[in-house]
Amino acid sequence: MNLMFHQARNNNSFMVAATSNQQHHKTALHVLEDKASGQVYDNQRIIASEQHSYGEYYIDEGKENSIPSESSARDYCGKELNKMASVTKESYVGGRLVDEDEDDYDDEGDREVYEDDITFDDDDDDENDDDDSDVKMNLRTNVNKLRFDSGFEYTLPTSSPENMTSFNPMSDSSHLFSDYSKHNSTILANGKSGTSYLTSTPRRIYDNTNMINIPEETKNIPTCYNGNNHVPSESIFDNPLSSGANRRMTSPGHKIQPSTCSDMLFTLLAKDNKIEAEIPKCTGCEHRIFDRFILKVQDKPWHSQGLKCNDCSAQLSEKCFSRGNLVFCKDDFFKRFGTKCTACGHGIPPTEVIRRAQDNVYHLEGFCCFLCHEKMGTGDQFYLLEDNRLVCKKDYEQAKSRDADIENGVKRPRTTITAKQLETLKSAYNQSPKPARHVREQLSSETGLDMRVVQVWFQNRRAKEKRIKRDTGRQRWGHFFSRNQLPSGPTSPISAPVTTGQKKRSNTKCGNRLIHCKDNQQNSQSHSSPLDGSPVFPIGSIGTGMQGEIGASFQSGCAVGIEGTSDLPSVMDPKNLPPYSETLMSYTEANPSHFVHGQNPSDVTYMNTLPVGGSHVPLTAVPQHNISAFSLPFHMEGNMVPDPSTQFMMATGHLGSQDTDLVSNSSGRSNFSDLSASPGSWLGELEHVQPF
């Protein structure tokens, strides 16, 4: 018997073939042993041989000789394979350990194989015997299925004329699996031992369609296709390097659907940690690289088809740019990491023409004024602001001029009106404060002023009249108001008590008079306003008219309001006057909070108004038909403080000189009738203003 031990140069796996030549009896036994695990699959009969993707693989054929039995060959092969697991870069040929450089041992005689030893017995001298000659088989995928007692399935390749096959070191890993087929293309039933089969040398072969030809009788065998190779399903194992849900584990006798042929190959190779460490890992996907070609970028390996631009996914073949573990094409690299345009912030390729402003770089299209968006060319003067924005010279000077005017307080030119023009406008205003359009046009032509100027003058004049009227009323009635309490003096302070409870009071209307009275027991309580419930202090009833005199009437605990002139004797009757009191004082201009003069209750002229210049003018009895009085309550929430310098109405009821001047100066005509004797006409205008 001739034992052929074929070893890959990378010392990963071994294949042992034992053949016997007897009369009408030939036996083939193929065993695949894995070096890393040390396990011998001798009961599986035939398993596809393997080879490392970076080494050359040479397989020699030996000669056939007879062996006593199949079991003896199996036992011997098992022992020898266990020894071969630790042998590197050496081969067993004919049962003898030789170096790689030594020629294959070729004994032309017959050999007898025993369990413990190998002896050679030459019993046949015919070298040209068809049964003894070497059979050269090709790698055509004429696959047949054989069944043995163990129940495992295997396939055999067809014959080939070559004796040795050399694989490219950088060939694809899917072509490293060999197939076997029967010599006579027949199918044997299970348990048929003693039938002769011939082994063949595995090699690659491609047909015209670049596909695998599978016989009809073997199409029911689960197979795996990868490239141009056909691999039996029993040789598929889990690949520890592959990721995903397709990873499966199998054992002899358990059929699974294989994932890929690469998984099967590298699962066997990965059992050796040294070999796994030598397989490069792709920098991009971090998977092992088993391609024929490897691309390197800065000494970092990449898949040949995986070197793509990180931004545009363009295939990089000649030149690329890297940053860290990322690779880019030229355009995308400069867009991301190149010089940025100050205006738009985008990257500028090195081939593009740019403009510079100090340390700033701009696109040609982005070098423009940010105000007028006018593109600036070569030789144009521009200004660079603090925020790196560009301004053309024209816009910069205009903006600078406006800023200077604001800082210096320069206002728009104002229209000057002469005295003659002013007299014409005042005369027209006295006739009509709101002239029509045709009147304004006539005034514009007479005065030579613009029509818009005439219109604005009338608007300002009306606003001034309204403002003067409001200010005059505020000065006249403001001394009646103060905050929280009446002014008090050292002699007789008068304070407004806070109302803690509302007492019952009676309202009596006598004719046209409305009298609010309260009980005599409530003299210590202050009155309440009939409008908002705030405490009030009863002051006298004061009336003003063009021909009337000022009259006042005080009554203890009462505020009398007279709307007409009937029943006036009852009001002016001395018995209705308040009793004599030392606390009744008259206001003075210097200190309006003091009542400094005692009054005689029998004299109706004891009350004094506020005189001009601080002198006290006694009141005289007035005719009944000239009295027009009203009730003036004092609100404690008021914030009005009397102004000592204010000129009030004289005792005669006529306006003072200062009031007359204010009215006469407001316009060319007399507006005396517009000034109301009551603050009700202008207090409503101040509701939205904070009290004073």
From Swiss-Prot:
Primary location recorded for the protein, binned into one broad class: nucleus
Listed Gene3D superfamilies: Cysteine Rich Protein, Homeodomain-like
Polar residues bias spans: 482-501
DNA bind region: 410-469
Single GO term (MF): RNA polymerase II transcription regulatory region sequence-specific DNA binding
UniProt-annotated location(s): Nucleus
Domain LIM zinc-binding residues, every copy: 280-339, 340-402
Comp. bias (Acidic residues): 99-133
Chain segments carrying region Disordered: 93-134, 480-509
GO cellular component: nucleus
Tissue: Isoform a and isoform b are differentially expressed: isoform a is maternally expressed in the animal half of early cleavage stage embryos, and zygotically in the sensory vesicle and the visceral ganglion lineages from the neurula stage onward. In contrast, isoform b is expressed only zygotically in the endoderm, notochord and mesenchyme lineages during cleavage stage.
PANTHER family given in the database record: LIM/HOMEOBOX PROTEIN LHX, LIM3, ISOFORM G
UniProt function note: May be involved in the determination of cell lineage of endoderm and notochord cells before gastrulation, and in specification of a distinct group of cells in neural tissue after gastrulation.
Record-given protein name: LIM/homeobox protein Lhx3
Upper taxonomic lineage: Eukaryota, Metazoa, Chordata, Tunicata, Ascidiacea
Gene symbol of the encoding locus: LHX3
